Amino acid sequence: MSGVVMEALNVEKVLGTGPAQVRALKGVSLTLRGGELTLLMGPSGSGKTTLLSILGCMLSPTEGTVRVRGEAIEGKGPEELAKIRRENIGFVFQSYHLFPTLTAADNVRLALDVRDEGGRKAKNRAREALARVGLAQKTINYPKQLSGGEQQRVAIARAVVGEPSVVLADEPTAALDAENGKAIMGILAEIAKDPNRGVLVVTHDPRLVPYADRIVHIEDGNIVREETRDGTRREETSGKA
């Protein structure tokens, strides 16, 4: 485990207006460290997706602070937030979001194009990223020629090809069978061994717990419990009434 790569401090989020207002997050604090895979677990409607959107600089908190590599996101404009995302954050989703007319390598290379990295170097980096997830022989295949598990591997390669500080994965195994789900979690756990990178996996599936260094439980917008792989537990790490 290494230093802090991302942290949320007393984050509140109010959604909606008037009588329909909902406090989706209630003073949540969460720290992601390099060399660590963290699970964020909770039932539907617990605030998992809202917190992930804020950590991913796609949604601003109503109150509180989010820092990415020590840089606070509050007050940043859309262009500044986009720059923080490009340089620091990789995303993996339940649905793979691959372009059907592009090969696996070209889908991965897109992540470098948005960082203004092109040419032969970008092609080589895309191939290397695919090799890391076990797809060295599938670089010229199109998404329709790949299984669901292989498509998710391409999505992971795309997320890490730019060497981000943080990988945020939203239910990455939900659309996969058990065997492919294990393979994907094994890859994410391996990626999380990098001391300069933290991985956060959002899930409701307890079968993913063995892959985690730390498990954070969220309920009704509050982080109610944290556990570590060795069984150490800390209760009620957030929870404003």
Indicate residue ranges for each PLM-predicted region.
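ABC-family P-loop ATPase nucleotide-binding domain
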Residues: 1-14, 225-241
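H-loop (His-switch) and adjacent beta-strand-loop-beta switch element
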Residues: 215-227
